[in-house]
């Protein structure tokens, strides 16, 4: 069973686009960032959806480019005393929850996520209280307060496996906040899932009819889709998965052309994984009134070179993540469950190899 919680659709105001930098300015900030990372004993942790030059800098300086699960793992095991998280705010909060002794800096604390914004803790807590017989599973794209209200935190890379596990134990589920991913895992597992009505502003814009027209132009291309996309788009896919799973699919699929329905920031690592293949952006209807994000998260785009340099140099209120101690303790429980479950999955996969 899958029921959608009926909340009002919200149009979120987007941040202004970062000012473009000259080649000389970019080189200045890259050099400054490298120096500041050394001086602060810091390491960069960047998400796949940040701009290519940010991902390249993270790699060049010994940092990490990954999905949110691997970002969490990397930050927990690295020896640096400071983590510079290039992503959105919930990623910085997660890093602080898992590493309270470390300084967590972000280029800006105003980098939001529509899934986080669409799941306010007071409203969500009331919803959970109305269904006390259900296990509460929340996506990593949520605030520390929402995580603290949950029994489990999950990323898209292990969502199906976790819901299968809970279903095998006879659990009924509350899933939040992404309605498309919740619907996808329900269909994959047959579990009893009650979905909160949230959506990613990037993936929600992929259009079935436009994708069909693109497939006519590229009939031999494979279609890769993130499960935060609408069901009708997911049903057209040759491969469905998280960011890391889509990169792996790009490597292993035989097709030489790939239509990719996720944030175009992923193209940097995906092209590294299969340089011989042609990557094509799935249509969102193009620039203009019919698309707002146009396949790139506007908050991820806030993680520019200038902002990163400022974050490392200035720190303080505008850049440092703090999480209340009691809230951290509450959120750490479901986060550790996620990490332990993910580790057990890896062991099981190795055991079956």
Swiss-Prot record:
<dbReference type="Pfam" id="PF02445">
    <property type="entry name" value="NadA"/>
</dbReference>
<feature type="binding site">
    <location>
        <position position="243"/>
    </location>
    <ligand>
        <name>iminosuccinate</name>
    </ligand>
</feature>
<dbReference type="GO" id="GO:0008987">
    <property type="term" value="F:quinolinate synthetase A activity"/>
</dbReference>
<comment type="pathway">
    <text>Cofactor biosynthesis; NAD(+) biosynthesis; quinolinate from iminoaspartate: step 1/1.</text>
</comment>
<protein>
    <recommendedName>
        <fullName>Quinolinate synthase</fullName>
        <ecNumber>2.5.1.72</ecNumber>
    </recommendedName>
</protein>
<keyword id="KW-0808">Transferase</keyword>
<keyword id="KW-0662">Pyridine nucleotide biosynthesis</keyword>
<dbReference type="InterPro" id="IPR003473">
    <property type="entry name" value="NadA"/>
</dbReference>
<dbReference type="GO" id="GO:0034628">
    <property type="term" value="P:'de novo' NAD biosynthetic process from L-aspartate"/>
</dbReference>
<dbReference type="GO" id="GO:0051539">
    <property type="term" value="F:4 iron, 4 sulfur cluster binding"/>
</dbReference>
<feature type="binding site">
    <location>
        <position position="113"/>
    </location>
    <ligand>
        <name>[4Fe-4S] cluster</name>
    </ligand>
</feature>
<dbReference type="GO" id="GO:0005829">
    <property type="term" value="C:cytosol"/>
</dbReference>
<keyword id="KW-0479">Metal-binding</keyword>
<feature type="binding site">
    <location>
        <position position="68"/>
    </location>
    <ligand>
        <name>iminosuccinate</name>
    </ligand>
</feature>
<feature type="binding site">
    <location>
        <position position="200"/>
    </location>
    <ligand>
        <name>[4Fe-4S] cluster</name>
    </ligand>
</feature>
<dbReference type="GO" id="GO:0046872">
    <property type="term" value="F:metal ion binding"/>
</dbReference>
<feature type="binding site">
    <location>
        <position position="156"/>
    </location>
    <ligand>
        <name>iminosuccinate</name>
    </ligand>
</feature>
<feature type="binding site">
    <location>
        <position position="47"/>
    </location>
    <ligand>
        <name>iminosuccinate</name>
    </ligand>
</feature>
<feature type="binding site">
    <location>
        <begin position="139"/>
        <end position="141"/>
    </location>
    <ligand>
        <name>iminosuccinate</name>
    </ligand>
</feature>
<dbReference type="InterPro" id="IPR023513">
    <property type="entry name" value="Quinolinate_synth_A_type1"/>
</dbReference>
<feature type="binding site">
    <location>
        <position position="297"/>
    </location>
    <ligand>
        <name>[4Fe-4S] cluster</name>
    </ligand>
</feature>
<dbReference type="InterPro" id="IPR036094">
    <property type="entry name" value="NadA_sf"/>
</dbReference>
<keyword id="KW-0411">Iron-sulfur</keyword>
<keyword id="KW-0963">Cytoplasm</keyword>
<feature type="binding site">
    <location>
        <begin position="226"/>
        <end position="228"/>
    </location>
    <ligand>
        <name>iminosuccinate</name>
    </ligand>
</feature>
<keyword id="KW-0004">4Fe-4S</keyword>
<keyword id="KW-0408">Iron</keyword>
<comment type="function">
    <text>Catalyzes the condensation of iminoaspartate with dihydroxyacetone phosphate to form quinolinate.</text>
</comment>
<comment type="similarity">
    <text>Belongs to the quinolinate synthase family. Type 1 subfamily.</text>
</comment>
């Amino acid at each position: 069973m899958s029921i959608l919680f009926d909340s009002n659709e919200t149009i979120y105001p987007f941040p202004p686009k970062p000012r473009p930098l000259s080649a000389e300015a970019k080189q200045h900030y890259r050099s400054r960032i490298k120096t500041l990372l050394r001086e602060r004993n810091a390491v960069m942790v960047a998400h796949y959806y940040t701009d290519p030059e940010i991902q390249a800098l993270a790699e060049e300086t010994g940092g990490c480019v990954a999905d949110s699960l691997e970002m969490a793992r990397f930050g927990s095991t690295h020896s640096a005393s400071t983590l510079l998280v290039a992503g959105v705010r919930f990623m910085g909060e997660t890093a602080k929850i898992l590493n309270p002794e470390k300084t967590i800096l972000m280029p800006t604390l105003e980098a939001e996520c529509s899934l986080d914004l669409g799941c306010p803790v007071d409203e969500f807590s009331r919803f959970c209280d109305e269904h006390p017989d259900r296990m509460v599973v929340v996506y990593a794209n949520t605030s520390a307060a929402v995580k603290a209200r949950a029994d489990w935190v999950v990323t898209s890379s292990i969502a199906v496996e976790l819901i299968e596990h809970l279903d095998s134990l006879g659990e009924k589920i509350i899933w939040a906040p992404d309605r498309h991913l919740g619907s996808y895992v329900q269909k994959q597992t047959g579990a009893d899932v009650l979905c909160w009505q949230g959506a990613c502003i990037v993936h929600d814009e992929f259009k079935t009819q436009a994708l069909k027209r693109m497939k006519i132009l590229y009939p031999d291309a494979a279609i890769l889709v993130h499960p935060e996309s609408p069901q009708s788009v997911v049903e057209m896919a040759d491969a469905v998965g998280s960011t890391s799973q889509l990169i792996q699919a790009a490597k292993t699929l035989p097709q030489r052309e790939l239509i990719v329905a996720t944030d175009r920031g992923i193209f940097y690592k995906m092209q590294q994984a299969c340089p011989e293949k042609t990557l094509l952006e799935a249509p969102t209807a193009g620039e203009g009134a019919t698309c707002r994000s146009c396949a790139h998260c506007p908050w991820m785009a806030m993680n520019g070179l200038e902002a990163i340099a400022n974050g490392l140099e200035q720190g303080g209120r505008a850049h440092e993540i703090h999480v209340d101690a009691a809230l951290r303790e509450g959120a750490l429980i479901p986060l550790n469950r996620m990490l332990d479950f993910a580790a057990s999955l890896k062991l099981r996969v190795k055991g079956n190899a």
